[in-house]
């Protein structure tokens, strides 16, 4: 007996040496195996010692989140929704906590080793129609559950990248609820999502849960054709123009089976005629005998190819809602730190922020704000081997109706960004005793004109990998200075709003008088836990601000002493 205990003790010691971290409850252990990375989040493989299952450990840096407006709100929205929503086709959140010492937010979620449905479909091109119908039924079950909440929950960013697969069982679950919203009014108003999957009414800022049905239709189109919707468009503005003009993606014409095409087109109908998730789940197409569909994927599985640029595979609950933006590991690209530039021109503020994604791509976000209260945010990719700053800027102006002076400003900012990016890369390589960039490399960067190998390659590179374009009013009473004022405070207050939003899900379901005692106790416990988490975060934020002020004062004093 004693020898057995000693043996188990040796195993325990070996296991403890293998893991990197343990959660406060002592139930979950994190390994150093990285499953995926986002702009401010890293997903690690972890293990649940109680149930004996592998899980995903989502680690978010608070300092990084604070630097990205709106992301804290999205993160807390996702945490609250996942805690409140329980369904077999919605990804599970097991546990979450704030680590004050390391200044991180941690979430333990289900692990899907097969990755997203998009990656899974790309890997397995020859898929029987039965499988696609099975995926569709599961997605619709998840959507019906979200939309049946009181008030309804709208995902707003449904796409194959945000649907995850268990390849061993064929199980499919909806994830990435960071952009989801609780519909407390008849229609929602904010414009947000991924352009290729956004319903026309989303741009009009008057929509309801049926926008998710439109996105589901685009998911079906991608599953059937193995092509990203609107891949014929070269930038987000062209997608916007087609969607708002009710022009369907060219890939829809590649769907040969009339019943499949009819089913997809039902999802893309105007909102007033669009069926609900429950109605679609009862559609005869999903009940058809799979044996009759042998030719459904014949053309797409053999000839179609994904035309999107290579991307990092986003694992479950990647809160970096770009969705399509690839963010590489700093270990692979040590020069990939974020660069931000600012210009004031024609009484407008231009902000360009981005980072290098890989050897040939940089991901950028351009924000243009004017005193009238209108703000435009455009996400795009710059392909270093073929794109030019002027060409990218002119494309934006052509579709977004900007002035010629704004073309110059945007092109100049992109030029400066690329120069700084290449300069940072040179420094990084030098520090690691790697070869420096040659003189010719710098000349190419200065000119920002690199001829593509052929016309087809140029066309391919110009298909910018764009995640979203937002148009929304902001408070601009004091001009440019007001644009940034109170942004952090708004993020924190929006967290409190999200708390109250989730409370209404329960409050509108049953009245206070109908609460059983055990439910009251559980709800009070949840309320106190999240209030404490908020206080912890607020304290961390205040500490970070004080540290920044102290560093600035110290730096200023040193400069005075030297002079």
From Swiss-Prot:
Q: What happens when the gene is disrupted?
A: Plants display early flowering and altered expression of genes involved in the photoperiod flowering pathway, such as ELF4, TOC1, CO and FT.
Q: Which residues carry this modification: Phosphoserine?
A: 509
Cross-referenced SUPFAM superfamilies: Protein kinase-like (PK-like)
Instruction: Give the GO biological process terms.
Output: photoperiodism, flowering; positive regulation of flower development; protein autophosphorylation; protein phosphorylation; regulation of flower development; vegetative to reproductive phase transition of meristem
Its subcellular locations are: Nucleus
List the Gene3D superfamilies hit by this protein, alphabetically: Phosphatidylinositol 3-kinase Catalytic Subunit, Chain A, domain 1, Phosphorylase Kinase, domain 1, Transferase(Phosphotransferase) domain 1
What Enzyme Commission number(s) apply to this enzyme?
Answer: 2.7.11.1
Task: Enumerate the spans annotated as Protein kinase domain.
Answer: 29-286
Q: Where is the composition biased (Polar residues)?
A: 426-436
InterPro entries in the record = Kinase-like_dom_sf, Prot_kinase_dom, Ser/Thr_kinase_AS, WNK_Ser-Thr_kinase
Please tell me, according to the UniProt entry, what happens when changing residue 41 to M.
Loss of autophosphorylation
Keyword Nucleus included in the entry's annotation: yes
**Which protein are we looking at?**
Serine/threonine-protein kinase WNK8
Record lineage: Eukaryota, Viridiplantae, Streptophyta, Embryophyta, Tracheophyta
Q: Which gene encodes it?
A: WNK8
